[in-house]
């Protein structure tokens, strides 16, 4: 993350793009949500590479431009890489991300679904936390062990085991397939 140092009016006095923990001048991060006036283009040279975080923000701070931070009371989760995204979903399912709840209806303790999920929960082995997206079909005899997220419009066949995995939308997991700590991108058939 970029790190900002602000005064008591939240005016940014310095900006560091991705410093090490030891080099960071504060614990206030820049999360990448910006509102600029059109005059910002006066500070950006044309015809060359110019990075907002590495070039523009330090320049604005140096110039003493009216450059402000807005403190927000929420947890920012970086999902720039697949392992980060996977961990973010697990963290939400486990209830570890402030102010973010699992969407849908809780059909069993720790098991949430979107609309129109076709599942006979009495004949499915499931232990949460689990989220199942809308329009998904889960056949009798399937096993789902959390933390697991199954996207919308999926089909989980009889005897399939989904354990600590993420399955994106429109995926089909065949009979007897075992997925343990797997990520299945959307529109795939497994097994």
Q: Over which residues does each language-model region extend?
A:
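Conserved core of the sugar-phosphate nucleotidyltransferase
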Residues: 1-48
């Amino acid at each position: 993350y970029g790190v900002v140092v602000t005064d008591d009016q939240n005016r940014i006095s310095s900006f560091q793009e991705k410093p090490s923990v030891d080099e960071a001048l504060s614990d206030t991060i820049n999360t990448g949500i910006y509102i600029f006036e059109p005059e910002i283009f006066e500070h950006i040279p044309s015809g060359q590479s110019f990075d907002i975080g590495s070039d523009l923000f330090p320049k604005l701070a140096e110039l003493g431009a009216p450059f402000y931070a807005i403190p927000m009371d929420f947890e920012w989760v970086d999902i720039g890489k697949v392992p980060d995204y996977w961990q973010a979903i697990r963290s939400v399912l486990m209830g570890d991300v402030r102010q973010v709840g699992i969407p849908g209806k809780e059909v069993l303790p720790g098991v949430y679904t979107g609309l129109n999920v076709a599942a006979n929960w009495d004949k499915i082995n499931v232990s949460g936390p689990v989220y199942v997206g809308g329009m998904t079909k889960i056949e009798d005899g399937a096993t789902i062990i959390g933390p697991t997220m199954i996207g919308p419009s999926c089909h989980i066949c009889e005897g399939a085991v989904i354990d600590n995995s993420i399955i994106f939308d429109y995926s089909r997991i065949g009979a007897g397939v075992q997925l343990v700590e797997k990520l299945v991108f959307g529109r795939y058939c497994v097994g």
